[in-house]
């Protein structure tokens, strides 16, 4: 989901899962000491993986597509070729934007983390879907032009899996970032919610531990474990559309009927030096004292980004005014602390 200068590689284990923290740390601590041979090697280009992946996704289109008018933002990323072919062969009414990667424009003013680009392209009644650059996450825009994050999509797919007897143990895994309204909806549906730290790898680990069918993050990383052990934006899109078709509803109507989200504000502070563990603890103390002073009827979350030099500060409360006031006060206190 980052600009091209952050492009890199992901290491996947033999089960198709992301590496555990201790293995990542071991690799990072040793990689600079490994001397690579100063020689060229050969490579082979193959379309076999594309064919297998296409067939895997295509066989899931077993539902009525006629009610969907879809606009897709592929973030000039890895989904650009396959999403067009999938929608074309299945006779969707669709349009695709940000679908011309040049090696530098990945996620540039587009994709799941720049959703305004998609919203501005939508006409009334159209459904929007935005991937990020590596297409492991999906954010949707409902027919009224309102953003639907991972919380909404997790609930939608969980209800579909439950209605078709595919929701193992009635368990849904989410992270501490999920909205309190989402958690209320999970409880109302008699699902058991397992909460993890932020990061799809922690979601995946909890899903294995609790034998869960679905889990994910508010950011749009969603894992449907009976199909894949990791998040996949295209798979999430197919299951979201499958669920809407099954329930014979629209995304805007599903949201209105099933989830009342609390106001949230997420601020990303760009920093040259990231706070260490002790500083984060001190910031949490500052936030706790402020919450007591302001009698905050809500919550806050302060954490370092795992991918960028940013401090992420989330505030959630029952009304917009409380969120805005507390967030502004907290951000000012954080800035003052970090400058001292």
Predicted features along the sequence, with ranges:
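Short hydrophobic/aromatic-enriched beta-strand-loop microsegments
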Residues: 91-98, 147-152, 190-198
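Gly/Ser/Thr-rich loops at beta-strand to alpha-helix junctions
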Residues: 2, 75-80, 135-136, 178-180, ...
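Gly/Ser/Thr-enriched, mixed-charge loops and adjacent short helices
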Residues: 5-124
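A generic beta-sheet turn/junction motif
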Residues: 76, 133, 304-308
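Phosphate-binding and adjacent anionic-ligand microenvironments
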Residues: 125-127, 164-340
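Predominant activation on well-ordered alpha-helical scaffold segments within soluble catalytic domains
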Residues: 28, 55-58, 81-84, 88, ...
């Amino acid at each position: 989901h980052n600009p091209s200068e952050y492009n890199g590689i992901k290491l996947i284990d033999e089960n198709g899962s992301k590496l555990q923290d201790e293995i990542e740390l071991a690799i990072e601590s040793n990689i600079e000491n490994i001397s690579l041979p100063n020689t060229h090697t050969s490579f082979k280009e193959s379309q076999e993986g594309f064919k297998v992946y296409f067939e895997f996704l295509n066989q899931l289109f077993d539902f009525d597509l006629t009610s969907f008018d879809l606009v897709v933002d592929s973030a000039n990323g890895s989904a650009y070729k396959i999403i067009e072919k999938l929608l074309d062969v299945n006779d969707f009414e669709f349009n695709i934007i940000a679908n011309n990667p040049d090696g530098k424009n990945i996620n540039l003013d587009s994709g799941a983390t720049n959703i305004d680009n998609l919203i501005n392209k939508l006409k009334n009644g159209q459904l929007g879907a935005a991937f990020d650059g590596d297409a492991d996450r999906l954010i949707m825009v409902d027919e009224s032009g309102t953003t639907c994050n991972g919380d909404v999509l997790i609930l939608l797919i969980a209800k579909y899996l439950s209605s078709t007897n595919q929701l193992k143990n009635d368990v849904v895994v989410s992270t501490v970032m999920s909205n309190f309204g989402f958690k209320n909806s999970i409880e109302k549906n008699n699902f058991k919610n397992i909460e993890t730290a932020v990061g799809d790898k922690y979601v995946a680990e909890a899903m294995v531990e609790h034998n869960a069918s679905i889990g994910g993050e508010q950011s749009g990383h969603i894992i449907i474990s009976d199909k894949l052990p990791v998040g996949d934006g295209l798979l999430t899109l197919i299951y979201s559309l499958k669920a809407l078709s099954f329930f014979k509803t629209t995304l805007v109507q599903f949201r209105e009927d099933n989830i009342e989200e609390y106001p949230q504000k997420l601020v990303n502070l760009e920093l040259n030096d990231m706070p260490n563990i002790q500083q984060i603890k001190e910031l949490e103390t500052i936030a706790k004292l402020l919450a007591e002073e302001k009698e905050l009827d809500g919550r806050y979350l302060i954490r370092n980004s795992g991918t960028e030099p940013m401090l992420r500060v989330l505030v959630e409360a029952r009304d917009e005014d409380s969120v805005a006031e507390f967030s502004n006060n907290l951000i000012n206190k954080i800035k003052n602390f970090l400058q001292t």
